[in-house]
Amino acid sequence: MEMRYGKRRDLKQAAALLNECWRWAYKDIFDAAYLESMSDKGRHKKLLKGYKDGKRPLLLFGDAGELLGFCGFGESMTPGYPDDGEISAIYVRENAIGKGYGHALFTRAEKELYAQGYRNLVLDVLSQNERAIAFYLAHGYVKVQDRQFSRGGREYPMDIMRKEAHD
């Protein structure tokens, strides 16, 4: 098993994994047609933009060249939390859930953010994503705000969660 920072050449594989994870993790939240319409090419463009500006590094976790999960993090993009570090994405392949890979990625990203000088960390999560909310609660995050998320022509409730005052 290996954890490392992603490089430009890894972004296509990360984009494909992200779409794969959305399709299984959000199948009861988003419309099937919307999930199937997502393109790896479109995801790749978004990941590439974050990679190019250096504000959204990816930590990758894999085994023998197979990407099992990744975590994106950096400065906060969440309105109202400009001084926080943010975990912007964490996805683990479905058959790798429950093996500690998500925990390893998540805690490493937190450590990196703290090392960059952030005291508080923020993230957002779909309100219906009970598995993720339980994961974040177990890592010390608390819900601090509600917001809406637009995707595929619909609005979805989201929770903003925060972990405060790391010294």
Task: Label every model-predicted segment.
Residues 1-3:
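Extreme N-terminal starter segment of soluble prokaryotic enzymes
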Residues 93-95, 99, 127-128:
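Active-site acidic-Proline motif in GNAT/NAT acetyltransferases
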Residues 5-29, 33-95, 103-108, 112, ...:
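Acetyl-CoA-dependent GNAT
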Residues 99, 115-119:
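Short coil/turn segments at alpha/beta junctions that flank glycine-rich nucleotide-binding fingerprints
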Residues 82, 100, 131:
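Residues that form or flank phosphate/diphosphate-binding pockets in enzymes
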Residues 85, 119-133, 138-139, 145-167:
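C-terminal "cap" of GNAT-fold acetyltransferases
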